[in-house]
From Swiss-Prot:
The gene is DAPB. Its EC number is 3.4.14.5. It comes from the Eukaryota. Keywords: Aminopeptidase, Glycoprotein, Hydrolase, Membrane, Protease, Serine protease, Signal-anchor, Transmembrane, Transmembrane helix, Vacuole. Type IV dipeptidyl-peptidase which removes N-terminal dipeptides sequentially from polypeptides having unsubstituted N-termini provided that the penultimate residue is proline. This is Probable dipeptidyl-aminopeptidase B. Its main location: membrane. It comes from Pyricularia oryzae (strain 70-15 / ATCC MYA-4617 / FGSC 8958) (Rice blast fungus).
Amino acid sequence: MPVDKKSGNGRPSLDSVSSISTTSIVFDHLNDLEIHKKHRPHLMTESIRRDDHLSDFDDDDPLKQEMDGEGDLETGPFLAGRDAYTFGGGKYMDRKFRRIMIVVAGLLVAAWVGGLFVYIASKSYKHATTVEHDPEKTKAAALTSGKKITMDQVRSGTWYAASHDITWIAGPKGEDGLMIEVGADGKDYIVIEDGRAENPDSSAEAEVDVTASRRTLMKNGSFRYQGRMHIPSGAEPSRDQQKVLLRTEQKSNWRHSHTACYWIWDVATETAEPLIPASPDARVQNAQWSPTSDAIVFTRENNLYLRTIGSKKVTQITKDGGADLFYGVPDWVYEEEVIAGASTTWWSEDGKYVAFLRTNETGVPAFPVQYFMSRPSGASPKAGEETYPEVRDIKYPRSGSHNPVVDVQFYDIARGDVFTVDINGGFADEDRLITTVLWAGSQVIVKETNRVSDIMRVVLIDVKKRTGKTTRTVDVGKIDGGWFEISQNTKYIPADPKKGRDQDGYIDTVIHNDGDHLAYFSPPDNPDPIMLTSGPGWEVVDAPSAVDLENNLVYFIATKEGSTQRHVYSVQLDGKNMKSFTDTEAKGYYDVSFSSGAGYALLSYKGPKIPWQKVVSTPANNQRYEVLIEENKELAESARKYDLPLLNYGTLNVEGVELNYLERRPPQFSEKKKYPVLFHQYSGPGSQSVSQKFSVDFQSYVAASLGYIVVTFDGRGTGFIGRKNRVLVRSRLGEIEAQDQIAAAKHWASLGYVDPSRIAIWGWSYGGFQTLKTLEADAGRTFSYGMAVAPVTDWRFYDSIYTERYMLTPQQNEDGYTKSAVHNVSALASNKRFLLMHGASDDNVHFQNSLTLLDKLDMGAVENYDVHVFPDSDHSIFFHNANKIIYDKLENWLVNAFNGEWLKVNNAKPVELVHPTQLVREREKAKLRKRWQEIQNK
């Protein structure tokens, strides 16, 4: 379930600002009383609205136009309590009281002047920070007097860390360290760069042909064909770099897939020809070069074709593709939940065979997605039907319904025939998921599971002999009662006796020591691997990252230094001599991409400090290379001049399990105050929200600029806390996760700096589901408010592959599905209020989820909620300014909640009409009551 500066303002120190504001407010309101004393209106006992706050201070706040009354810098906006303030039970405010106020004000002024003198003399005041944002340092000392971050900055990407992607390619002769650049500033449009020739070490440069360091494949970012101009949106060079496959007129389909017009660019002649000569404007779903650069396989209208280079011949490989049959491309559910990509086509390394998936959706029910404001198909409606919504029917298998039937097929280029290989003992068609297809020389490794993903088998197919066998079967349910994790990272290791590899093999992720670890299977049919990593207490992540075949080294990312960190390591193929590639002495969260031969790497440091990127040589490379390509200077400057939240990392023990949390505190946090708390979580199985990555997002904004505490807490069921704690949620999604969020909220409610009456929770997608389940389980005892965006409310409505992995089928687990649905509306009614938002054209979590919940709320006469629907928005909620609106709604709704506005929604009664001057007097008195209460509290 799944979504890219200025100098300090020189304000006085925090202490000075707060003192000035306190005394000034007293005198201002004494003057107000003098002006209005002749009217002497009664003071009514009432809850004080936060929009009545004075906002004379902090006038430069960019959010002030959107929200009345920010409050002063010390308090932060909207932190005052909600209790009613009264003076003498409604008696007149007489002269005696005024004299008391004057005396109090005088004492406060004297105390402030004396304190200011001592404060300045001791030189203990702080200016805006001048150091790089460091979460570890902010634990000890708050950043002071900086600018406030704004939601517009968060939305516009001001706080995004700049980053670069490198597309590594192998040279025509297998050369390592080559990169392709497309559309780079100051360079030709498509350029092959050889990093070896730009080595800072001059001695290494001498070994490389510098003239070959940069090769242009396409000079201009456009081309003409038959008088028409075309602008590429993507490019893929052939292995021999003589031609380039170009995409134009690209149109998005689902999350990963698209259609486009494809062209073959000839580097030597600088001309283009259509991939399909007879149909230049034909829309193609997927196209791939053969490793031998002499052919392209592609899918059009769900059929597979072969284009031979050197001729205009196009061979149709399959002929029955259509609405229900897919060849070489995934259907919706495989694209979303299995492949995480747009292609199910795989060339053999010698270019003699093509493996592909055949997906049959004949039995899969369709779900209609309606578009009321737009027509994504681009088709014009029929005359007289212009006012009807466009409907797109998606074959969407829900839990317990018919799944697509998927099998692996092969095309023999020389013989021109399609064939399959039957394996005894396999899963039945309706009970089979194919998760991995990997060429291993002339053999193919296929990993498949049953539909509930708890039995996995590995099949080895010999395409030349057209035979196959099952090499190993793993019953994950018997290991820990959990499920098999889908991965696309299995790596083939070819035999090389000179390097000590007598036989072919492959590296895969297996369950070992309560976690995911790397295993080396050689030969491929050997069921007993060499364990490359073993733990316990840590796991590998999306591993392996790369294999250096020259040096028998395997690179991978792991949580060895801590579950919220990511470091890069290497290990030998015999499982010995594991070394860190990154600096493990400091906390860090790294990502990495390796060159084709693993001699070079793009190393990306993502936090906790300001992110940076370097291109470096790997330890086994004798040519030392290190170039900083991104240091995010502008981001670092912003972090120095803006007040960012204080980050407090830790663990909370729940049921004997140490669970990670991240507490974001306001920049001027004080344990003497009472703060509202917003919990933000995703909570999906195997997910992780608490990490050491640098991030300034909506949660950061709420903490830093609204002045609330924001807690992210990863409960049981989430990732990297050991499989036994991850798989506890199987068959009962939402139950344990809710218990853990409630336990965390109770912990924060017990803290002296938290207002236990103002605790809220929010989330999107699975996080929206978990928000509702937590409110349901808590029934208002701990959480007062919640905000759920695009939530699942009944797992019977979600797709089969994702849902059944964790819940089994509804037929197997009827009681579990019933309990996991959001169903106890009386418990939801016990909360003060909650917000529900959804995109009406969500193809992932269907709008039916929210409509079903609304119907249950109606049937239960529950009214303590608000709803916002976004027309034509999908799961990301972006259509027609929707993404801005949804975050504005989240912010304003939360502020109103913590201000107590939602306490007035039941048994609404009209307000007695009064003269406008009376309203002014009442408002001024309300301001005074509030400020007097603040003085007493201090």
